[in-house]
């Protein structure tokens, strides 16, 4: 029950009741006995409004229903308030007056032998067999409870009498002594397990101090207030102070079995599980750590710990952690109840520094001696992942699992979004260990985390209004947005796609489409989403490149994933191809998802080209002249070829015409014949002008092209049937076809309407004016809305669009296809430019028209239509500027000239040049990526001719073929004769696909085996990809190591020259300046050490300077020579120096070859300057 602070203090809103059922529990806990309850309360986050769970009372089915919550105004409670009025005045705690707290912690004694027996019977009914821990606790409390006659009225509420303060002290000391004894035994066992170097007497003294502190705490309070108020725990029957009693009751029985009770303790046996009461909001208590969080901060941070970790001094680190105090006397140690934020940050930095420097032994010591909380382990995991240390990651995960007794609650990593204590870390919001490992493509660590159950939760949609998203937005909007971006970076990484997806290629396609949509919905982060989309496309491209034979290529490109069958973009992928052509479902899905890199891959293009040519093996290698000759022959013989296929589709000629390239040439020849007929109609209109000038021409003379239009209409209807309406309308060429056909049909309908009107009006009265208008009237007598006017205009527009439709076949040629794509992009830019153009043009149109309307001095200004034409042609320099002159009206003339000049500057100089720049930019983008763009467009053209059917071109497709009649009769026969259930089994849309080397494999295994083979191929490709990525990573690191070694060689040579110059100066007896010389050497040594601090961790108990043999010797010898004023020091000779540098190179190269993952030591402090 959620209550505000005010409600919890005043005791309001306490009427909520919730009955638990079996469905409320998890499957493993369903039907089992339980002794504790974990309740999670949530509500929309409000920054300036506090909330919390005031009181929680859990009752079992055995509780008496006749024991309602007493009202504060009841007699019992009023008497209690009167007896404790003095105490409440001195310590006004709001929760102390609550009836639930009074009844729970100070109950009336009602125990007897019969009640105990009945209670034991009820416990047996609840849990057959051996009694559980909760049942034993209840029975222990009932056995130790005294009879009701022994307890005084004041003690019936669990509050000691003020006249007998000595009775409360033994009750408080007895359980404390026993608790301290048990803790001492446990500490002795732990001390025996510790190494000998870490043994000391500090822990014992610390334990003794804590015991004395607990024993003296009630006395100190009694000295201050005069009377010490104590209560007894109903679980362990121990006596504790009023302030410590709720805290103890919340944790009683968690770490140890119930302690023996004092004879004066009280208990209640009315219920089994009604004794758990928690106060969260009104009482500032330290929460007990639950199973999803580790909270145990005991040690005060020693100031010298960071320096000891930096220097790799393992012994000092162990001494600081085990003693709990600073040996230098900087500060006392010991346990701390409340750790400040600075302390928490210091412990984090210590663990992070040990991990970052690669000190695995020190890291183990920190993890063994300090109990870090979940947030600290979370940040340490991020550091271990960032420095690529799988061993440390494995230790941290094991630490979490050991502390919690189960696997890590991976959802807690996502909940770190609300943890403000990690805002000062070096990692961005929303970055989890798995996300960071995937972003860095650390496959080993990512696989390790996934094996532990870690996952990356996919972010909710942008418009999601759920409780989690609304709280995150209100908590921190920027942090929420950055968390989404970082999560998508992990999901779109190569490691996550490879390891977390069953079909990595399909997952990359779908994620790329999702990121493209997010780029449109969230323009603030469009560059980031576009970069991630490009990463997904590159991954699919690289994964396809892992194929090693044609069988793998066939399995990858010819299967549709199960998850994508419900996607809108997958509509139409079930269409069948011609016999002998694989379905290429995955390739078509890539085209629908706009995966240009994948489609333009050489493997995909090779497959498409081989299918495109079919059995014409010599077509690809033939010259352009030969191809043009074959195309011209097909153009001339197109009618005869179509008739031959119409009569015998299964003949050799029919199978030859089904080859995609010949089908393409056949359809292109048909469309060229259609355009020739359009040109012929235009020429006939010029030669027979007298006939077409009036209404003497017939409908059929002007509508011969309708034969092709009818064929086009039937062709488009079959395409909609095969592809689906949505997939059909997504193609802009199909949209253009719909417009062209609509205009042709409208023009033909208007001509039919005109002929029908003439027939109807002349049938009864042939001499009427209406009949004369529709038959013999001259063109000058026609009305503006005459149907023939509209028909001729529509036919003219449609003829123009029909010729532009010829650009559809241009992608078949490389140069023409690239130009066609560039023109399409330019048209897109011009459409967007027209919006700005119309806004500015309309603004100046209204201004100039309003100036010249009252004067009417010129024909081109003062009228809206004329002014628009004047301004439009002015943009192209086809108008005279003297049109705006009005000499007799000076002011309007000046304003008109000024506006016209500004219009010329804005439109001609600015906007037109901007349009030219936009068009040039679009053309350059296409030209830079011309190969990919052209191959993608050509692939779409190829796939459109792979489909089954649609072999006969227009207009021969409108003739009912014998093949169509045969198929129709076969379907009718099957429907009538084979209507049994055995014949209704649906054939798989994707049967086993034969390879190109084995065409007879169509009668292969079933669909399930084929799908499993496809998944095996995908897994093999992913494994090859991971191995290739690891080899490239090792090669890059090896090259980087070589560069570092080269830099080290140059630095050592410079250092030797400096040493030689110093030797000469000392030998000549010149004046030395030790600080300057020391700073020079320190600078060189610092550079060398910083360059090599990533090559491996230093040895334990060894300063960082001693990890470079050969260089430190020179430094030490030089320091000796500088200290001995006037005495010539003899450092290593040139031969020894060269050998030292060679030793450094060999030694470090061996270390680099043996080191697996080299940590980064960015925070290592140098000690060169002294």
Swiss-Prot record:
It is found in: Membrane. Signal peptide: none annotated. One of its GO terms (molecular function) is damaged DNA binding. Residues 74-85 have a biased composition (Polar residues). Disulfide bonds: none annotated. The gene is Trpc2. GO terms for biological process: acrosome reaction; aggressive behavior; calcium ion transmembrane transport; calcium ion transport; female courtship behavior; inter-male aggressive behavior; mating behavior, sex discrimination; negative regulation of male mating behavior. This is Short transient receptor potential channel 2. InterPro entries: Ankyrin_rpt-contain_sf, Galactose-bd-like_sf, Ion_trans_dom, TRP_dom, TRPC2_channel, TRPC_channel, Xrcc1_N. The keyword Calcium applies. Expressed exclusively in vomeronasal organ neurons (sensory microvilli). Keywords: ANK repeat, Calcium, Calcium channel, Calcium transport, Coiled coil, Ion channel, Ion transport, Membrane, Repeat, Transmembrane, Transmembrane helix, Transport. Residues 649-658, 723-737, 810-832, 920-1170 are extracellular. ANK repeats lie at residues 300-329, 346-376, 377-405, 429-458. It is a multi-pass membrane protein. Residues 1030-1068 form a coiled coil. Thought to form a receptor-activated calcium permeant cation channel. Probably is operated by a phosphatidylinositol second messenger system activated by receptor tyrosine kinases or G-protein coupled receptors. Is not activated by intracellular calcium store depletion. Residues 158-177 have a biased composition (Basic and acidic residues). Pfam families: Ion_trans (PF00520), TRP_2 (PF08344), XRCC1_N (PF01834). Its main location: membrane. GO terms for cellular component: cation channel complex; dendrite membrane; endomembrane system; nucleus; plasma membrane. Belongs to the transient receptor (TC 1.A.4) family. STrpC subfamily. TRPC2 sub-subfamily. Residues 64-113, 142-231, 322-342, 1118-1170 are annotated as: Disordered. Residues 1-627, 680-701, 759-788, 854-898 are cytoplasmic. The chain crosses the membrane at residues 628-648, 659-679, 702-722, 738-758, 789-809, 833-853, 899-919.
């Amino acid at each position: 029950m959620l209550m505000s602070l005010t409600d919890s203090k005043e005791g309001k809103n306490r009427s909520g009741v919730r009955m638990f059922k079996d469905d409320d529990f998890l499957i493993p806990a369903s039907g089992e006995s339980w002794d504790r309850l974990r309740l999670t309360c949530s509500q929309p986050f409000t920054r300036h409004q506090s909330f919390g769970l005031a009181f929680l009372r859990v009752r079992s089915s055995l509780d008496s229903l006749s024991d309602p919550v007493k009202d504060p105004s009841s007699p019992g409670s009023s008497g209690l308030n009167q007896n404790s009025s003095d105490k409440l005045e001195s310590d006004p705690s709001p929760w102390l007056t609550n009836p639930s707290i009074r009844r729970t912690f100070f109950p009336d004694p009602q125990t007897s032998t019969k009640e105990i027996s009945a209670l034991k019977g009820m416990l047996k009914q609840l849990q057959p067999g051996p009694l559980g821990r909760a049942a034993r606790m209840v029975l222990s409390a009932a056995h130790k409870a005294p009879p009701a006659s022994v307890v005084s009225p004041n003690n019936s509420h669990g509050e000691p009498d003020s006249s007998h303060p000595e009775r409360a002290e033994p009750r408080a000391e007895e359980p404390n002594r026993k608790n301290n004894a048990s803790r001492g035994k446990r500490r002795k066992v732990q001390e025996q397990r510790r190494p000998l170097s870490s043994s000391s007497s500090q822990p014992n003294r610390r334990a003794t101090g804590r015991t004395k502190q607990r024993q003296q705490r009630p006395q100190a309070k009694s000295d201050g207030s005069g009377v010490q108020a104590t209560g007894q725990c109903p679980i362990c029957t121990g006596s504790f102070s009023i302030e410590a009693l709720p805290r103890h009751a919340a944790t009683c029985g968690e770490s140890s079995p119930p302690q023996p009770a004092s004879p004066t303790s009280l208990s209640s046996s009315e219920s089994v599980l009604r004794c758990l009461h928690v106060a969260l909001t009104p009482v500032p208590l330290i929460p007990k750590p639950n199973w999803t969080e580790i909270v145990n901060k005991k040690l005060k941070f020693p100031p010298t710990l960071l320096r000891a970790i930096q220097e790799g001094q393992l012994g000092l680190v162990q001494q600081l952690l085990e003693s709990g105090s600073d040996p230098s006397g900087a500060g006392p140690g010991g346990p701390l109840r409340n750790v400040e934020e600075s302390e928490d940050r210091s412990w984090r930095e210590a663990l992070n520094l040990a991990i970052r420097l690669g000190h695995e032994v020190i890291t183990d010591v920190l993890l063994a001696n300090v109990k870090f909380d979940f947030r600290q382990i979370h940040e340490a995991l991020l550091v271990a992942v960032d420095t690529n240390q799988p061993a440390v990651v494995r230790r941290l995960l094991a630490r979490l699992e050991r502390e919690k007794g189960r696997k890590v609650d991976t959802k807690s990593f996502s909940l770190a979004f609300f943890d403000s204590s990690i805002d000062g870390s070096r990692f961005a919001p929303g970055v989890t260990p798995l996300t960071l490992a995937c972003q860095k493509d650390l496959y080993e660590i990512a696989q390790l985390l996934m094996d532990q159950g870690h996952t990356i939760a996919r972010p909710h949609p942008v418009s999601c209004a759920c409780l989690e998203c609304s709280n995150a937005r209100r908590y921190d909007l920027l942090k929420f947005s950055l968390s989404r971006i970082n999560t998508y970076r992990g999901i779109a990484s190569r490691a996550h796609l490879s390891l977390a997806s069953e079909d990595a290629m399909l997952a990359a396609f779908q994620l790329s489409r999702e990121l493209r949509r997010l780029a449109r919905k969230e323009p603030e982060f469009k560059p980031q989403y576009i970069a991630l989309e490009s990463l997904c496309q590159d991954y699919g491209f690289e994964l396809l490149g892992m194929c090693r034979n044609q069988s793998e290529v066939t399995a990858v490109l010819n299967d549709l994933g199960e998850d994508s069958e419900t996607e809108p973009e997958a509509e139409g992928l079930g269409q069948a191809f011609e016999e002998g052509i694989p379905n290429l479902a995955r390739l078509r899905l890539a085209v629908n998802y706009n995966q240009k890199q994948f489609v333009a891959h050489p493997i995909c293009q090779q497959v498409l080209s081989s299918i495109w040519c079919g059995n014409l093996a010599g077509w690809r290698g033939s010259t352009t002249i030969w191809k043009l000759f074959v195309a011209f022959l097909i153009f001339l013989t197109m009618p005869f070829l179509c008739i031959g296929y119409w009569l015998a589709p299964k003949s050799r000629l029919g199978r030859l015409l089904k080859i995609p390239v010949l089908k393409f040439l056949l359809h292109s020849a048909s469309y060229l014949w259609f355009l020739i007929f359009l040109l012929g109609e235009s020429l006939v209109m010029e030669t027979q002008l007298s006939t077409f000038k009036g209404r003497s021409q017939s409908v059929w003379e002007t509508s011969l092209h309708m034969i092709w239009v009818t064929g086009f209409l039937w062709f488009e209807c079959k395409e909609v049937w095969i592809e689906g309406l949505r997939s059909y309308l997504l193609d802009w060429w199909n949209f253009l076809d719909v417009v062209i056909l609509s205009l042709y049909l409208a023009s033909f309908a208007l001509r039919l309407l005109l002929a029908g009107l003439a027939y109807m009006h002349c049938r009864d009265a042939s001499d009427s004016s209406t009949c004369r208008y529709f038959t013999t009237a001259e063109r000058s007598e026609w009305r503006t809305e005459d149907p023939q006017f509209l028909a001729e205009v529509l036919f003219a527009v449609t003829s123009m669009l029909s010729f532009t439709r010829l650009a559809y076949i241009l992608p078949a040629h490389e140069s023409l296809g690239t130009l066609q794509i560039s023109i399409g992009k330019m048209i897109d830019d011009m459409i967007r430019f027209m919006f700005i153009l119309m806004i500015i043009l309309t603004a100046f149109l209204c201004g100039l028209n309003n100036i010249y309307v009252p004067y009417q001095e010129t024909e081109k200004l003062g009228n809206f239509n004329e002014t628009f034409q004047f301004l439009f042609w002015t943009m192209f320099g086809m108008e005279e500027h003297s049109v705006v002159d009005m000499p007799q009206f000076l002011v309007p003339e000046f304003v008109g000239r000024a506006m016209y000049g500004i219009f010329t500057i804005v439109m001609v100089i600015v906007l037109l040049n901007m349009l030219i720049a936009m068009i040039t930019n679009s053309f350059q983008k296409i030209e830079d990526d011309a190969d990919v763009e052209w191959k993608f467009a050509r692939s779409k053209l190829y796939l459109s001719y792979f489909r089954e059917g649609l072999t006969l071109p227009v207009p021969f497709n409108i003739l009912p073929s014998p093949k169509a009649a045969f198929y129709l009769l076969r379907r009718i026969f099957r429907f009538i004769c084979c209507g049994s259930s055995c014949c209704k089994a649906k054939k798989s849309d994707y049967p086993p696909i034969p390879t190109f080397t084995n065409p007879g494999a169509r009668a292969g295994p079933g669909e399930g085996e084929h799908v499993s083979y496809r998944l095996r191929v995908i897994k093999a490709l992913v494994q090859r990809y991971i191995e290739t990525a690891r080899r490239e990573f090792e090669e890059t690191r090896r090259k980087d190591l070589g560069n570092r070694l080269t830099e080290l060689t140059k630095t050592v040579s410079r250092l030797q020259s400096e040493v030689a110059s110093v030797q000469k100066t000392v030998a000549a007896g010149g004046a030395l300046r030790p600080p300057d010389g020391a700073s020079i050497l320190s600078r060189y040594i610092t550079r060398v050490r910083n360059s090599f601090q990533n090559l491996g961790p230093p040895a334990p108990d060894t300063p960082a300077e001693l990890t470079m043999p050969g260089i430190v010797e020179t430094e030490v010898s030089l320091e000796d020579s500088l200290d001995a004023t006037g005495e010539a020091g003899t450092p290593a000779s040139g031969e020894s120096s060269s050998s030292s540098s060679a030793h450094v190179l060999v030694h470090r190269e061996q270390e680099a070859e043996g080191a697996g993952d080299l940590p980064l030591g960015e925070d290592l402090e140098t000690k060169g300057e002294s």
